[in-house]
Amino acid sequence: KTCGSLLSTVTRQHTIPGLLFLDSPGHAAFHLMRKRGGNLADIAILVVDSQEGMKEQTLESLRILRQYKTPFIVAFNKIDQFAGWRSNNNIALMQSLKDQRDDVQHNLDTKLYTFVGKMSEENFQAERFDRVSDYTQQIAIVPVSAKTGEGIPELLMVVTGLAQKYLEQSLQTDVKGPGRGSVLEVTEESG
């Protein structure tokens, strides 16, 4: 439903059983939760504030994802906060980007490619999702606004496509076999 009209442009059938999202807070106090999440995840979405770029928690998350060889994409969030941004969540992200004024597009590209440069310093090749030439070599960055919903369909399409292409076998489930789960955090309360 969220991907809407984007699904009609895809000719390949989706075969993965679904996606489960775990939200690991970015605050420094949640280091252990991020580490456990990075260890257990089949694929990750690293949410980055486009206005702030690379922060210490971002670097930590990148290192965790590398350590556990977890494939990931970047959601470059808060694009609606660029000065002059005209939100329109009723059209595809690429059309919305084209409809922005030149200075707004330039500011977004400047922030995005500054972040790409910081990723390169950490030995990650990254590119805006529509410019990725090889998803096995480059990290896709999808500009999004969690507030307006812009870019969310594209983000879901990219993560679904990557999961289907590279993780389809590991995402298979045996509904007749035993279940398996992981506890990320336990809080003991008396009373």
Which stretches of residues belong to each language-model region?
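Short acidic, glycine/serine/threonine-rich loops at helix termini
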Residues: 33-34, 58-59, 84-90, 154
